[in-house]
From Swiss-Prot:
It comes from Chlorobium phaeobacteroides (strain DSM 266 / SMG 266 / 2430). One of its GO terms (biological process) is translation. The gene is rplX. One of its GO terms (molecular function) is structural constituent of ribosome. One of its GO terms (cellular component) is ribosome. This is Large ribosomal subunit protein uL24.
Amino acid sequence: MKTGIKKVKLHVKKNDMVVVISGNDKGKTGKILRVFPVKGRVIVEGVNIRKRHMKPTQGNPQGSIIEREFAIHASNVKKS
């Protein structure tokens, strides 16, 4: 019986240097920090930076807004 989850073989892997070939960050270069083969997405250093609102916790009672990289589709990058 199939589970419905299909792993996509990607042309890039962790620590590869890549160039973004489409999207808002077109032309930017960076190192791949993380790969998600099931979703076909990658996280590239310094690309697709977004703000993330963190809830207040015991360790950080104020809460905060942090900027971090979010995943982009692997078809939007190529090795450099």
